[in-house]
Every structure is written in structure tokens, then in C-alpha cells.
Amino acid sequence: MQDTERKEAALPTSIFLIGMMASGKSTIGKILARTLGWPFFDVDREIEKRSGVAISTIFELEGEAGFRARETQMMAELTAKPGAVVAMGGGAPMFDINRTLLKRGFVIELRSSVSDILERTRRDTTRPLLQTEDRARRIRELLLERGPVYTSVADAFVVTSRANPERVVERILAMPEVAAIRARVDAGQRGEPA
């Protein structure tokens, strides 16, 4: 993100996690939020709660376009909450409107290797984009497509491959930008949890 864009926007008071599926966004997000004493939101889980059905069912019934519309609507709501940690869906940053919404917070990309993602998802049958015979190839394709977008959107990144989630959170908390966000929130700029 360009410095001039950040200067024009209000200083962030929330942390948004982006990255590939199974990169650790939910696990690390929960630990980070608990450590900060902030609410944690996972965009996909919030969509499931509101709709009453699994993401895979939404993909089946409404297609990817229907899911993406729900995702953008949920992101618009969650990115407006100050003092929150929000885990975004892996494909969310691929859309202009969602990239604009991400400018409301400090964006951290969680990076993981193909082999780690493959290992973490090997028994997972709920991810619509991995319902293919060659999962490793599909993950590589998604990384090639999404990686440059993640990098362009992120304010910072952390490698999560083979890393202990608590250590990853320690690295995030050590970022000067995160310390500044924490100070702003502690000074009273936090909203109410949902």
C-alpha cells in the first residue's frame, strides 16, 4: 500500500489478516485477538453464522459470485469495527471493492508454503476451490494468482510455514505499527464487539 494512500485514510485501529487458505489466519487471529483483548472475527465463519449454511453450500446454491457478494457485504461490516482482528477469506483481496475495504485497517499477510497448505488441508473436504484431483497443483495455481495481490495489499507479512502460532503472534506484536494501533485502541478508539 502506498504511503500517500495511508496518509489520506484514517490511521488504522484494526488488524486484518489475509493469505491463502490454511495459512493460519483463524488460528493466529484468535490468539492475537485474545492477547490484545480484542474481538476476533472470521469473515467466512460470520457468513456461515448469518446464512445458517456452510460456505460449500453457498457455493453450490449461489455459485462463487453469490458467495463473493456475501463476502463483500460482511467485509464492509467487519472492517468498520475498530479494535478488532479480522481474518479474511483467501480470495477476498482479489476484488477491487474488497481491496478498498482493506484500507480501513493494518493488513498482515500470512505466508505459507504449498507443502504446508497441502498438509493442513489434506483431510479437509469443505473447501470448494480444492475439490479437484490434483490439490497440490491447484494450490500452486492459486498462490501464483493471489500471491502478488496479497503482497500489493499487505502492510506487512509473516511466514507461518512450520511456525508455532504463538511465535507468529509474538512477531506480529513486535511490529511497531501494531504497537501504535494497540496504543490508539487503548486510548479509547475501540468499538463494541459484535
Give residue ranges: language-model regions:
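NTP-dependent small-molecule kinase module
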Residues: 2-10, 31, 35, 144-194
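Walker A/P-loop
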Residues: 26
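A glycine- and Lys/Arg-enriched "phosphate-lid" helix/loop adjacent to the NTP-binding pocket
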Residues: 104-148
